[in-house]
C-alpha cells in the first residue's frame, strides 16, 4: 500500500493552521460527556487522532486521519479537549483490526490499528512535525528519509517486564491500564518474542499452582511483584528474574525444579529484592537462584554477556540495522578516533572499533561502564576504553590531555543532549558527528544549537518499536568550515 500523504504535515491547509487558535467561548460551553461529529486531520506525537471542534484542537485516542468519528469529550483543558470514540462514521482505509484485544487499554500498542506502511509514514512525519515546530537552521531543506521498517513488525521485543497481581483469585501478569494501577492480564502479546511469553505464562501458572504469595499493592503484602523474561536472540538463552517484596521466596526450590525440567532454555534465574511501595521496578540487590548470572547475546560478530540490569536494545533485528546506519554515516578511516557519548554497555562504540584507531566512551552509570569494558575484553578489543563520568566534563579533560576526537556518536536518552555537552561538542568540533535519537522533539531542539557548528546531511528514521508511536532516527552532520 502506498504511504498516504495525509500522514504528512505538508498536506495541512492554511485553514487547518487557523483552526489551532482556540475559541474560548466555545471551550467554556463544552462539557465532559458531550458528543459531536469530528473529522480527524492528522496524528499527534503520541499516535492520537487530532481534529478541531469549532477551532478547538481535540485529541481522540484511537482515531485515524481522514476518519469521521462521533467523539465524546473526556477532559476539557484551557487550550484543548480530550475525547474518545463513540462510533466511527467513516473509517480510514488504513484502519486494520489489532491482533491484541487489549491494544487500546495498555501502553505500547497505540498504533496497532494502523496499517504498517501508514505507521512508517507517520514516523517520518513525526520528525517533520518536530522540525516545523522548533525550526533549526535550514530545516526546510533537510533530507528526511523514509522510515526503515521490519518485514514482520511483530514478535520483536526480547524482554517482557510484567507486573504480577491477583485478579479474582488468579495470578495475573501483564501491564497497567494507561494512567492507572489497574492490571491487564496478558496471556498473549503479539510484539514479544514468542519464547518470552512461553516462559512468562508457564511461570505464572506455576506461581498459582504452588500458591506462592503474590504482592498486594494496597496492603503492601505478599511477595512476587514483577516477572522479567529476557531472551538473547542469537543464542536462544533466556534469563528469568523474580522481583520480590522480601528476600524470602516461598516454594523457591519447587519452582526451580519445574523450571529446570520444563524450560531448558532458561539458563539464568535471578531474584531482585525491591521492598515496599515504590514506583521503581528494580531494587538494588540482585542474587543468583540457578544457572549463570548472565545470558549471552551476539550482535554483528560481537558477544555480550547481559546481566539482569544491563541495558540492551529491545529489538535485536532493528538494532543491527541501526548500528549499520551509524557505521555508514560515520564512514570512519583507520586513523580516526571516535568518542562514544552515552555509551551504555558499549554496544555502539565496540561495533565501530574495528574501523577506528581508538574508541573512547563515557557513561554516568558505573555498572554500565564496567560492563562496557568487560565487553571490550570479552571480544578482545584493545582499542576501546570506557570511563565513568559526564561527557561535558570528560571531553574537555581529554582535549586538554591532547586527545582530539575525529568523530563522535551520541545516543542520548529521550530528554536529549545536555546543553553543556552541546557546548563541549561545538568546542571540540569533531569533523564527523552522528546523533542517534529516540525522541524527535528533543532532537529538533538540539539541532537548533548544533547547527551553529554543523550542517545536517540527512535524517534517517528507523522503526525500532512497531505498533507504537515511538520513533528513532540517525542524523549525520558535516562540520561547517
Curated annotation (Swiss-Prot):
Keywords: Methyltransferase, S-adenosyl-L-methionine, Transferase
GO biological process: rRNA base methylation
Protein name from the UniProt record: Uncharacterized RNA methyltransferase lp_3226
Pfam families found in the cross-reference section: TRAM (PF01938), tRNA_U5-meth_tr (PF05958)
Gene3D superfamilies with a match to the protein in the record: 2.40.50.1070, Nucleic acid-binding proteins (2.40.50.140), Vaccinia Virus protein VP39 (3.40.50.150)
Record: active site: 438
UniProt source species: Lactiplantibacillus plantarum (strain ATCC BAA-793 / NCIMB 8826 / WCFS1) (Lactobacillus plantarum)
GO molecular function: rRNA (uridine-C5-)-methyltransferase activity
Region (Disordered): 1-28
